[in-house]
Amino acid sequence: MLLDKLSRPLKVLRISLTDRCNLRCNFCMPPGKEYNFLPKRQLLTPEEIEEYVKIFAKLGVEKVRLTGGEPLLREDLEEIIQRISKVEGIKDIALTTNGVFLKERLKALKEAGLKRITVSVHSLNPEKNQKLVNRSVNLGEVFEVIIRAKELGFKVKVNSVIIKGFNDDEILDLARFFKNLGVTLRFIEYMDVGTVNDWDFSKVVSADEILNLMKKEFTFYPLPKRPEDTSMDFIYEDGNKFGIIASVTKPFCRGCNRIRLSADGKLYTCLFSDKGHDLRNAVDKENFIKEVWKDRKDRYSELRRQMKRERKVEMFKVGG
């Protein structure tokens, strides 16, 4: 088994398929229209992705999550999923999306081998949502596609980043809404990923604050948590679930078994990394991956208060 310096195994590969997105969420994407995104010719091809996934599977990876940017901007997404689904050792393929372009491609994604979908929804209020994503989004259509995905047999979850003073007044509304839909909602503490989001700890709504608020309206119980789980999960009395990803106040670095591959072929051993490792141009890719992982000692979230405010990779380049 391939282990890093803290004896953590490599089990999950997150692939950013593009750094582009149709939205401009304040906590993720650069503002304005002039940002110099990667030219399409520099993006990993389906053939390259398949080649790399085969190597990662050989080294112990069992799960692949496709992210962005917005992965549905890739016209060859279905081909990519189909290729990954045929790789021996890969047990699960998931997709993270804002859901805007999902409706027309659900069936094809299912046929290609996609098993799980996570949709990002940060507000139920159209005006407030527009302030966050800086685009007009038909939330009704996003909710409809979530329901449709569930009907087609996808395992569906919703992620909501909670920011103090912005959408923390919607915590119970979000919980109530997705509980009624029978969809697992995961609240995410506002994180200091990258440098474009003007992050400050005062904007963080902690897991404890969320739980104390939830207890005022709902009865629920904690579910067992494995060291590698990112989410603290809870079950309501009716069997529906919700979770909290508390990277800021309750770090889970010690169990982190994930590596990230950017859209142009660079490996990042942590969401908060300040540099990537160029897999694309490595001659012996298998040994390159081994050495990168063996040398890994990241635990940024555990050391956040001790770390310097150095420039970190932006979220839209490596996925959340």
From Swiss-Prot:
Binding locations of GTP: R14, R65, T96, K157, R258, I259, R260
InterPro entries, sorted: Aldolase_TIM, Elp3/MiaA/NifB-like_rSAM, MoaA, MoaA_NifB_PqqE_Fe-S-bd_CS, MoaA_twitch, MoCo_biosynth_MoaA/MoaC, rSAM
Family assignment from sequence similarity: Belongs to the radical SAM superfamily. MoaA family.
EC number(s) on file: 4.1.99.22
Protein name per Swiss-Prot or TrEMBL: GTP 3',8-cyclase
Xref: SMART domains: Elp3 (SM00729)
Role according to the record: Catalyzes the cyclization of GTP to (8S)-3',8-cyclo-7,8-dihydroguanosine 5'-triphosphate.
Catalysis: reaction(s): GTP + AH2 + S-adenosyl-L-methionine = (8S)-3',8-cyclo-7,8-dihydroguanosine 5'-triphosphate + 5'-deoxyadenosine + L-methionine + A + H(+)
Binding site for [4Fe-4S] cluster 1: C21, C25, C28
Cofactor needs: [4Fe-4S] cluster
Chain segments annotated as transmembrane: none
SUPFAM superfamilies with a match to the protein in the record: Radical SAM enzymes
GO molecular function: 4 iron, 4 sulfur cluster binding; cyclic pyranopterin monophosphate synthase activity; GTP 3',8'-cyclase activity; GTP binding; metal ion binding; S-adenosyl-L-methionine binding
Location of the Radical SAM core domain: 5-222
The keyword Ligase is annotated on this UniProt entry: no
Pathway assigned in UniProt: Cofactor biosynthesis; molybdopterin biosynthesis
Subunit structure: Monomer and homodimer.
Binding-site list for [4Fe-4S] cluster 2: C253, C256, C270
Cofactor note text: Binds 2 [4Fe-4S] clusters. Binds 1 [4Fe-4S] cluster coordinated with 3 cysteines and an exchangeable S-adenosyl-L-methionine and 1 [4Fe-4S] cluster coordinated with 3 cysteines and the GTP-derived substrate.
Lineage: Bacteria, Pseudomonadati, Aquificota, Aquificia, Aquificales
GO biological process: Mo-molybdopterin cofactor biosynthetic process
UniProt: S-adenosyl-L-methionine binding residues: G69, S120, M191
Annotated keywords: 4Fe-4S, GTP-binding, Iron, Iron-sulfur, Lyase, Metal-binding, Molybdenum cofactor biosynthesis, Nucleotide-binding, S-adenosyl-L-methionine
